[in-house]
């Protein structure tokens, strides 16, 4: 169940084009089991887990803004920034309180070839952090907390009551694009991203338990048509995504 609000903006100011987007989501996720960490898909397998789980509440904030500016008749420069914040919690044991911050910036340039063909390139940088804390107030029964390492395994030495962790990391990437100025005909995009995120157990003197490295390569090829009233098109997408994990030995 979710409630959300969404606002978009797009305008021309002189030669510049400015755009932005902001939205807010408030919702709940039911029947969560063996995961007490936010951003599951990004941080798997290095999650904090227990066998109880339950329903979690969440709030999600997103802000994005960018601009582009022509330099003569051939060149155009642009930049875009976005920030995502998320809070996830539960009001009964076990009680996670997760706060995430994800900041991303992108800078790019495009060049108009002969005719209507345009090529572009961009670089991206990213900063990520999550505090992942779990509280247990039941004095009669306390579940075992696991620090998962994938394939049904966990780091046995840290199993128990180490319930305060955080994740921090960075990402870098690049993008190449091809399109036509009138937004008709063929278009293509190739994108690469590398991320490096550390999992740190706060309750063990900031112990660096593991490092997760991931690479993603994405390609899109498509074709657009315009009959004067609306656009029609089709595209083909492909993704190659790999993760590499390193668990430190203590």
How would you describe each model-predicted region?
Residues 5-11, 63-69, 105-111, 174-180, ...:
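Residues on the lipid-exposed face of transmembrane beta-strands in outer-membrane beta-barrel proteins
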Residues 32-49, 139-157:
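Surface-exposed loop/turn segments flanking beta-strands in extracellular/periplasmic regions
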Residues 12-16, 72-74, 112-116, 181-183, ...:
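Outer-membrane beta-barrel channels and translocator barrels
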Residues 1-5, 57-63, 97-103, 168-174, ...:
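Residues that define the transmembrane beta-barrel architecture of outer-membrane proteins
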Residues 1, 31-37, 89-96, 132-138, ...:
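Outer-membrane beta-barrel translocator domains and adjoining extracellular loop/strand segments
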């Amino acid at each position: 169940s979710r409630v959300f609000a969404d606002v978009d903006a797009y305008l021309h100011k002189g030669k510049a084009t400015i755009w932005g987007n902001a939205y807010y989501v408030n919702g709940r996720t039911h029947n969560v089991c063996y995961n007490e960490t936010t951003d599951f898909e990004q941080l798997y397998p290095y999650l904090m887990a227990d066998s109880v789980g339950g329903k979690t509440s969440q709030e999600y904030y997103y802000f994005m803004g960018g601009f582009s500016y022509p330099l003569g008749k051939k060149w155009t420069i642009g930049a875009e920034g976005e920030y995502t914040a998320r809070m996830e919690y539960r009001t009964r044991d076990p009680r996670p309180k997760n706060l995430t911050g994800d900041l991303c910036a992108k800078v790019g340039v495009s060049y108009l070839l002969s005719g209507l063909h345009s090529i572009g390139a961009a670089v991206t940088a990213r900063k990520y952090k999550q505090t992942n804390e779990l509280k247990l107030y039941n004095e009669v029964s306390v579940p075992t907390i696991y620090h998962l390492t994938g394939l049904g395994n966990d780091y046995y030495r840290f199993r128990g009551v180490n319930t305060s962790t955080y994740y921090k990391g960075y990402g870098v990437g690049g993008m190449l694009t091809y399109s036509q100025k009138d937004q008709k005909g063929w278009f293509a995009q190739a994108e690469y991203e590398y991320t490096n995120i550390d999992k740190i157990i706060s309750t063990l003197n900031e112990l660096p338990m593991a490092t997760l490295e991931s690479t993603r390569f994405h390609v899109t090829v498509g074709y657009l048509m315009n009959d004067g009233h609306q656009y029609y098109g089709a595209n083909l997408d492909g993704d190659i995504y790999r993760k590499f994990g390193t668990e430190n030995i203590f």
